[in-house]
């Protein structure tokens, strides 16, 4: 972002809301390669054409020169015209890919600059490690003791391209840029299928992930705007810690009594209290909204959201895409965890003068459990075990050295432990570690043409044990076991901000 601001200080065209001239600037395509989600088509296409990486700058300059040639670069919106067919031939596909990469950077400029100015006004410190996905951690840490319903919501889709263009007009007021965006979206909409037999016209693919992720996130942003409004309206108890406070369990009983007694005199004051408190989180295309209320009120919320999306944003959604369930009888997958609410019973002793009472109190506890069966299925797909979870050797890795084999198994084991460190029950991870440890031993034994028992007896099992417990020993140095409060902290859930960088097991083959 700092590098982009340096370039924009020189090029003032964006300050007059003119983004289209930026398509003719070489640094835009350089930035598209530097922080792209995937490998840039600048270098990939250069390799296909026989150039090295140093020639990519020359390719960009030639591409910009071709854009200046009005007769050479013709865009036709007619899907059946001969001009468009010629435009989408092999020689023109590279140009279209280049524009899509540049557009992905250019269209983010108004949003990025507004974000920076907003942070400066609020005097907030920017953190490069924080992402929107990290907001899920606060949702999983909440006890949800005061909520009783959860709505499983699917983000409405598909969306017509023209609606998305009209929505972007609020932020991007440059008409030529909007026309170019409209062309891209209609091309995508007309083709229907992105994967074609001919690789030469495989335009809107993973190479353009950044471009389409921006459009998708903007679409989700419009859908979520109503939840942000509701969150602000239901702001009572928002500043209170979400700990399992006993007084919290009786709050709603007191509130209902308050409404009955002072309904006529304090109607305006009670509006803030009567609003339902909600807790909202989104992961990928699904979102969850936990709230408190009756089944009738939750159904009203469902149809309100459907009508609101259709009336104001023209998003066609169906009531069946919003599933309402009781929180106590529902479990859902979120960020690789199986989350559910269970009752946690506790006994409180109350002393009144000479009499004492034992009070049983049931409080909701939000558990995040490792889904052991899907995780074993992933290990079986990666050929670390069979479908039943029995460890097997990895013949493909036997050509590597012993150190490389142990290192690859160790990285997978540490990644799984690292990713699922936020689980409230870590005992299920022991089975995963056992599968990987025994699979590593069998792979080494297969390489040396020996049995697992003979191999471990010859080298000793301490090597594997020390390697797989390295992370736990590091944590034990940070949180000494001698201290009781720190020992409890050692057992608590830990959320790492870099879990989004951990690769899938299948990609480690």
UniProtKB/Swiss-Prot annotation:
Function: Usually encoded in the trnK tRNA gene intron. Probably assists in splicing its own and other chloroplast group II introns.
Residue stretches in coiled coil: none
Organism: Macadamia integrifolia
Molecular function per GO: RNA binding
Listed name of the protein: Maturase K
Entry keyword annotation includes tRNA processing: yes
Pfam families named in the record: Intron_maturas2, MatK_N
Keyword Repeat: no
GO cellular component: chloroplast
InterPro entries registered for this protein in UniProt: Domain_X (IPR024937), Maturase_MatK (IPR002866), Maturase_MatK_N (IPR024942)
Location(s), subcellular: Plastid, Chloroplast
Family named by the database record: Belongs to the intron maturase 2 family. MatK subfamily.
Entry keyword set: Chloroplast, mRNA processing, Plastid, RNA-binding, tRNA processing
GO BP: mRNA processing; RNA splicing; tRNA processing
């Amino acid at each position: 972002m700092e590098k982009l601001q340096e370039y924009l200080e020189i090029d003032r065209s964006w300050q007059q809301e003119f983004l289209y001239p930026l398509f003719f600037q070489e640094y835009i395509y350089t930035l598209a390669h530097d922080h792209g989600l995937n490998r840039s088509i600048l270098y990939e296409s250069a390799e296909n054409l026989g150039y090295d990486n140093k020639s990519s700058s020359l390719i960009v300059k030639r591409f910009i020169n071709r854009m200046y040639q009005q007769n050479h670069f013709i865009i036709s919106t007619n899907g059946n015209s001969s001009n468009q067919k010629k435009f989408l031939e092999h020689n023109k596909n590279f140009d279209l890919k280049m524009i899509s990469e540049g557009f992905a950077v250019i269209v983010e400029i108004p949003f990025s600059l507004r974000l920076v100015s907003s942070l400066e006004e609020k005097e907030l410190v920017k953190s490069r490690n924080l992402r929107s996905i990290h907001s899920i951690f606060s949702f999983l840490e909440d006890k949800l003791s005061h909520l009783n319903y959860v709505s499983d919501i699917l983000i409405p889709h598909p969306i017509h391209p023209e609606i998305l263009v009209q929505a972007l007009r609020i932020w991007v007021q440059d008409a030529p840029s909007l026309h170019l965006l409209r062309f891209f979206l209609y091309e995508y909409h007309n083709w229907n299928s992105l994967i074609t037999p001919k690789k030469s016209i495989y335009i809107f693919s993973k190479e353009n992930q950044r471009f389409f992720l921006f459009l998708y996130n903007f679409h989700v942003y419009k859908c979520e705007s109503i939840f942000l409004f509701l969150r602000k309206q239901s702001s009572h108890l928002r500043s209170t810690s979400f700990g399992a406070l006993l007084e919290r369990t009786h709050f709603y009983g007191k509130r209902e009594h308050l409404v009955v007694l002072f309904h006529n005199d304090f109607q305006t004051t009670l509006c803030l209290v009567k609003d339902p408190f909600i807790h909202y989180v989104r992961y990928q295309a699904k979102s969850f909204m936990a709230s408190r209320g009756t089944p009738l009120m939750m159904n009203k919320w469902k149809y309100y959201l459907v009508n609101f999306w259709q009336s104001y944003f023209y998003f066609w959604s169906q009531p069946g895409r919003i599933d309402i369930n009781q929180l106590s009888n529902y479990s859902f997958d979120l960020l690789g965890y199986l989350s559910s609410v269970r009752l946690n019973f506790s006994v409180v002793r109350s002393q009144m003068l000479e009499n004492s009472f034992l009070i049983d109190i049931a409080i909701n506890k939000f558990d995040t459990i490792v889904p052991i069966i899907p995780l074993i299925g992933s290990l079986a797909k990666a050929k670390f075990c069979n479908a039943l979870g029995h460890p097997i050797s990895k013949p493909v890795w036997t050509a590597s050295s012993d150190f490389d084999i142990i290192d690859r198994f160790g990285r997978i084991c540490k990644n799984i432990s690292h990713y699922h460190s936020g689980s409230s029950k870590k005992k299920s991870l022991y089975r995963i570690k056992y599968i990987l440890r025994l699979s590593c031993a069998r792979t080494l034994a297969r390489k040396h043409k020996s049995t697992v028992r003979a191999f471990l007896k010859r080298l000793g099992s301490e090597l594997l044990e020390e390697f797989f417990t390295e992370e736990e020993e590091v944590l034990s140095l940070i949180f000494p076991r001698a201290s009781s409060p720190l020992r409890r902290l050692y057992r608590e859930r830990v959320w790492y901000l870099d879990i989004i960088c951990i690769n899938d097991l299948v990609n480690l083959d």
